[in-house]
């Protein structure tokens, strides 16, 4: 059962790469999901990092700056108009 769950998480991470799956569980205010290298776990290469971390700029709802939330709890790149 654990194997099926892990594979499902891995596939989910591949198909929604921006802020998932750590964004799904949420980060505290002032923190956002950030791709860590090397990955902390095989199924979740993202971790919650502070907005004050060098090079990290968190936007609303735990997404990185320049991204907005999607209905499935992930993040997507903002489309610039003009």
UniProtKB/Swiss-Prot annotation:
Keywords, ordered alphabetically: Disulfide bond, Ion channel impairing toxin, Secreted, Signal, Toxin
Highest taxon, organism lineage: Eukaryota
GO cellular component: a single term: extracellular region
Entry annotated with the keyword RNA-binding: no
GO molecular function: ion channel regulator activity; toxin activity
Disulphide bonds in the chain: 22-33, 27-48, 32-61, 58-69, 63-75
Major location (coarse): secreted
Signal peptide bounds: 1-21
Cellular localisation: Secreted
Tissue specificity: Expressed by the venom gland.
Task performed by this protein: Probable ion channel inhibitor.
Protein name according to UniProt: U17-hexatoxin-Hi1a
Species the sequence originates in: Hadronyche infensa
Higher taxonomy: Eukaryota, Metazoa, Ecdysozoa, Arthropoda, Chelicerata
